[in-house]
Amino acid sequence: MLVLCGLLPVAVSAKTLDEQYPAPWIKADNPSITRAFSEADIDGCGKYRYRVSSGSKSEFLVYCTHGGRVTQAFMVWPNIHKLMGPYPPDPSLP
């Protein structure tokens, strides 16, 4: 796995990133995620796709996109106003 996995709580659970955040990618806007980016003054993530954690429906792996290309990754917990990143996207996730 890429550096992203080493920096995330995923490493503790011994699950792969794909198991922790199973497909599919959701491409629709999520007001909670959008608000979390706004509150954290994150630029460059106006368009994104995300996966919901298998362990918590309020935890998301978010990939920011620009021009159809993934540029950066974040962990987002909107319910507790927490955001971690940016991280490089993991190329093993389709």
Would you name each region that the model predicts?
Residues M1-P9:
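Bacterial N-terminal signal peptides
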